[in-house]
Swiss-Prot record:
Chaperone recorded as keyword: no
Name of protein: Small ribosomal subunit protein uS2
Cellular component, GO, one term: cytosolic small ribosomal subunit
Gene source species: Rhodopseudomonas palustris (strain BisB18)
CDD domains: RPS2
Gene that this polypeptide is encoded by: rpsB
PROSITE patterns: RIBOSOMAL_S2_1, RIBOSOMAL_S2_2
GO BP, one annotated term: translation
Length: 334
C-alpha cells in the first residue's frame, strides 16, 4: 500500500476551491484565499494540495504507530460519508450530536457505552421476552438514542490519538476538548472558519457533498495505508507463506449448525488473526471454529457474510474493519 494520491483536478471537480460569500469570511483565513468571484471567495488550491498531503501523512503515521483515528462530522452532508469511511478503515466516528465531555469526561462516556452494550445484550437475547411490550419499546428507544451518539465509538476502548473534523465551526466543542487533551486535530477549514489550534489544517469547502466524500475517502485510504505499514513494521510478512490449496472439510468434521454455518477453510500454516484490531486469542479461536484461518479468507467475504461472522464471534461492529484490514494485508502480499 501507499499514501493515497489525488490531483488538483479532482479537487476542482469536487468543488473544494469554493469558499463562502465574501462578507461571511474569517480574516484569519486570508492567506489561504486566492481571490473572490461573484462575491464568493476562492480557496487557493496550490496551498490545499500540500497541506492535504501533510494531513494524510499524519493520519497514516498515527495508525502505523498503533494509534486510533476518530472521524467527526455531524452536519447532514457529512454524516453518511464519515460513518462509511470510518467503518471501511476500522476506525471510529461521531456523526450525530457531539456529547459534551466525549473526550474530556471519558469515564462518564464509558459508563454510557456500557449501558448501550447491556441494552444490546438484553434486546438481542431471550431475556427480552421477560419484559412487556411497552417495556421493550422503552428499552429500544433508549438503546437507539445511545447508539446514535455513541455507536461509532463504543469499540474505541479509550481516547483517540488523532481526530479528523469536517467543519470546525460546527465541531468547535470537539476541537476544544481535543486541544485540552493535546490530541492532534486534522480538519477541513473553510473561509468562514478560524484556523487557530488546528494541527493539520486543510483549506477547503466543508459544505459540498462531493468534496466531503473525497476528503473522507482519502483519509480512510491513509488509515488503511497506516494499517499496512504497521503490519510490515511488526515483521509480519504476508507473502512469506504460500496460500495452501483449498480443501473441503469432510462432512463428519463440519461444525455444528449455528446461525452461520462456517467456511470450508483450508488448513496448513494459519495466519496470526490476532493482528486484526480487537481480535484476542479467544476471538481467533472462534474464527478458527468457523473455518477461518487466513487473511485472504476474510478479504474475500461479502458484507452480509462478514457481518454474520462478526455476530458469531461477538463483535459485529468490527466486521467491516476486519475485511478492510485483511484486504490491505493481502494487497501488500500481492
Amino acid at each position: 500500500m501507499a499514501l493515497p494520491e489525488f490531483s488538483m483536478r479532482q479537487l476542482l471537480e469536487a468543488g473544494v476551491h469554493f469558499g463562502h460569500q465574501s462578507h461571511r469570511w474569517n480574516p484569519k483565513m486570508a492567506e489561504y484565499i486566492f481571490g473572490a468571484r461573484n462575491n464568493i471567495h476562492i480557496i487557493d488550491l496550490a496551498q490545499t494540495v500540500p497541506l492535504l498531503h501533510r494531513a494524510l501523512q499524519a493520519v497514516s503515521d498515527t495508525v502505523a504507530k498503533g494509534g486510533r483515528v476518530l472521524f467527526v462530522g455531524t452536519k447532514r452532508q457529512a454524516q453518511d460519508g464519515v460513518a462509511e469511511a470510518a467503518k471501511r478503515s476500522a476506525q471510529y466516528f461521531v456523526n450525530s450530536r457531539w456529547l459534551g465531555g466525549t473526550l474530556t469526561n471519558w469515564k462518564t462516556i464509558s459508563g454510557s457505552i456500557k449501558r448501550l452494550r447491556h441494552l444490546d445484550e438484553v434486546l438481542n437475547s431471550g431475556d427480552a421476552n421477560a419484559y412487556t411490550k411497552k417495556e421493550r419499546l422503552t428499552l429500544q428507544r433508549e438503546r437507539d438514542k445511545l447508539d446514535r451518539s455513541l455507536g461509532g465509538i463504543k469499540d474505541m476502548g479509550g481516547l483517540p490519538d488523532l481526530i479528523f473534523v469536517i467543519d470546525t465551526n460546527k465541531e468547535d466543542i470537539a476541537i476544544q476538548e481535543a486541544q485540552r487533551l493535546n490530541i492532534p486535530v486534522a480538519a477541513i477549514v473553510d473561509t468562514n472558519c478560524d484556523p487557530k489550534g488546528i494541527t493539520y489544517l486543510v483549506p477547503g469547502n466543508d459544505d459540498a457533498g462531493r468534496a466531503i466524500t473525497l476528503y473522507c475517502d482519502l483519509i480512510a485510504r491513509a488509515v488503511i495505508d497506516g494499517i499496512s505499514r504497521a503490519q510490515g513494521d511488526s515483521g509480519f510478512d504476508i507473502g512469506a507463506s504460500v496460500a495452501p490449496v483449498r480443501e473441503e472439510l469432510p462432512a463428519a468434521a463440519a461444525p455444528t449448525a449455528t446461525a452461520f454455518q462456517g467456511l470450508a477453510g483450508p488448513r496448513g500454516t494459519a495466519d496470526d488473526l490476532k493482528k486484526l484490531t480487537g481480535v484476542s486469542g479467544a476471538i481467533e479461536k472462534k474464527f478458527n471454529d468457523l473455518g477461518i484461518f487466513h487473511f485472504w479468507q476474510l478479504a474475500e467475504l461479502d458484507r452480509d457474510t462478514a457481518h454474520k461472522i462478526g455476530e458469531e464471534v461477538g463483535l459485529p461492529s468490527r466486521a467491516d474493519g476486519w475485511v478492510a484490514q485483511a484486504k490491505a494485508m493481502t494487497a501488500e502480499a500481492e
